[in-house]
Amino acid sequence: MKTYLGIDVGSISYKFVLIDEKNQVLFWLYKRTEGNPILAIQNGFKELRKFIENHNAEIEIAGIATTGSGRYLAGVIAGADLIKNEITAHAKAISNFVPGAQTVIEIGGQDSKIIILENGVAVDFAMNLICSAGCGAFLDAQSFRLRIPVEKFGELAIKSKEPTTIGSRCSVFAESDMIHKQQIGHKIEDIVAGLCEGLARNYLGGVGRGKKINPPIVFLGGVSENLGMRKAFEKALEQKIIVPPYNTVMGALGAAILIKEMAPLKTKFRGFEISKKDIKCASFQCRGCPNQCEVIEAKIDGKIVARWGDRCAKWSNLNPV
């Protein structure tokens, strides 16, 4: 049975999605990297192997694609046949699972993006990689400070009757504003709802500035699990927000569909034994020109298997020694 694997490695979490030749999801995984993306990817392969052994030993991985900010690292570890940016991967998944969608709001752990689609093709996009305000890591920090499990954050927000106003342009000022609102007696649910509304405004005024946000509007990423953020976007846009199945793993799902469509004759997959290998990454600065690129070097069991990060390909084109 031929299957195709998509892997999305981000700043906070990693995702695996395995599909069959009809784009049916057979296995999916969404977990935190916990600051160690190499070990996270290896653990992902351990879980996938266990799933295959327990469900269908005849599953064959016919192709692997990686995406996300850690796509090159994941590609080297897995032996990817295709490495694609997350904009392309998300657009591909949405065109298959939410046909007709025109706007994609995606908020992850430390970045956020907007994708404008026409006939299933990304025609415009913007990303915020500078400030974490409104992203998953910021919401995690606030839920911890308020002693509310992040899973309950959204449920609490939608109970609010009078959301308070929270300044949300900057994560530092937003936190200070929340503390002030607590001190003057605002209810926790009103503060949480106010934070969600402020973050939605911040997103629309930042990442979404100047974009034509037309329905159907799809909300993806870990933050899309937050009911309060869904409600805040619906209030700000006065439009229904669609949160589709597999909303947290759409990047990996799109990568899997892309590699299925590419249909490599022979996969470069290194095999499940990669989960037991000694994998290390290091970097050095190339001083060959004024760019002074930071080159990343990956080793598996002491052998250099890849280099990347150089603009001119001086190092990445070298055969591993």
What are these regions, as identified by a protein language model?
Residues 1-24, 101-118, 162, 285-299:
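Gly/Thr-rich phosphate-binding beta-strand-loop-beta motif of the actin/hexokinase/Hsp70
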Residues 4-46, 124-125, 129-130, 311-312:
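Short glycine-rich, Thr/Ser-proximal phosphate-binding strand/loop in the N-terminal lobe
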Residues 29-33, 52-87, 116, 123-124:
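Short beta-strand-loop/turn "lid" adjacent to the catalytic site in phosphate-handling enzymes
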Residues 69-70, 209-236, 244-251:
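Glycine-rich phosphate-binding loops at beta-strand->alpha-helix junctions
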Residues 174-209:
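Adenine-nucleotide phosphate-binding core of ATP-dependent small-molecule kinases
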Residues 113, 261-321:
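Acidic, glycine/GT-rich loop-and beta-edge segments that sit at the periphery of enzyme/chaperone cores
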Residues 34-38, 119-162, 170, 261, ...:
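Glycine-rich phosphate-binding loop plus the immediately following alpha-helix
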Residues 136-140, 245-272:
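Glycine-rich phosphate-binding/hydrolytic loop that grips phosphoryl groups
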